[in-house]
Amino acid sequence: MEKRIELERRARKANQIQELNLDNCRSTSIVGLTDEYTALESLSLINVGLTTLKGFPKLPNLKKLELSDNRISSGLNYLTTSPKLQYLNLSGNKIKDLETLKPLEEFKSLAVLDLFNNDATQVDNYREKIFKMLPSLNFLDGFDCNDEEAQSEGDDDEEVNGNDSEEEVSGDDDEEDGDSDDSDEDGDNGEVSLSEVYNDDLEEDNSDWEEGEGGGDDDEEDSDIDDADGEANESSASLNASKKEPEKTDESQARGKKRKHDG
C-alpha cells in the first residue's frame, strides 16, 4: 500500500492531494496513509483485502469513502476522526448486525450509505431501523426511505445527451423546412417557364402548319403525274384498236372471195 500511495502522489505534497485511489493494492490494514493528508476529500480502498480499520488517519475534510469488497466486520469507530463524511460504501463486507453500525451515528452529515451484500441487511426491518438510526441519511443501498431509486451520475449524462440529440433533431427539421422553402421558390419559377413552354408549343404548331401547305404543292404535282399517265394509257389503247380494224377488214375480204369461189 505504501508504494501505491507514493505512486498516486506523483511528487505532490500530502496536504495538496484532494483525491486518492488505492483500489486493488493488497493489504489487510491501512499502512502509509497518515494525518498529513488534511486536504483529502475522496478516498477509495476497493478490493484491498482490509480486515480492520485500525490506523485509519484523521482526515478532517474527507467526504467520500469507498470501502467495498473488503473483509471488514467491525471497527467503524476508527472512522469518526473524519466528521465531514457524507458518502460511505461498505458493500461486500462482513458486517453481521446493526450494533456494528452504531459508530456511524457520529456522522451528522452522512447522506449516502451502502451496505449491500452484508449479513446485516437480513435483519428484520433493517431499512426502517437504519433510517431511524441515521436521521441525516437520504439513500440506503441505492434507495431512499420511500424505496425510490437514487439517480446516478450516468443518468444525468444520458439526460444531457438526450437534450443534445433533441436539439440536433430540431436542427434537422429546420434544415428540412429550409429545403421545402427552396422547393416552393423553384415551383414559382416553374410557373414562369410554363408560359415559355406554351409559346414554344405555339411556334411548333405554326411551323407544322406551314409544312402542311408545302405538302399541298406536292399533292398537285402527284395529280399532274397521274393525269399524264392516264393520257398515255388512252393513246396506247387507241393505237391497239386501229391495228385490230385492218385485221377485221382482211378477214371480211377473204370470206367474200370464198363465197364467190363456192358460187
Swiss-Prot record:
GO terms for biological process: nucleocytoplasmic transport. Belongs to the ANP32 family. LRR repeats lie at residues 16-37, 39-60, 61-83, 84-105. PANTHER family: ACIDIC LEUCINE-RICH NUCLEAR PHOSPHOPROTEIN 32, ACIDIC LEUCINE-RICH NUCLEAR PHOSPHOPROTEIN 32 FAMILY MEMBER A. This is Acidic leucine-rich nuclear phosphoprotein 32 family member A. It comes from Drosophila pseudoobscura pseudoobscura. Pfam families: LRR_9. The gene is Anp32a. Gene3D superfamilies: Ribonuclease Inhibitor. It is found in: Nucleus; Cytoplasm. GO terms for cellular component: cytoplasm; endoplasmic reticulum; nucleus; perinuclear region of cytoplasm. Residues 144-189, 198-232 have a biased composition (Acidic residues).
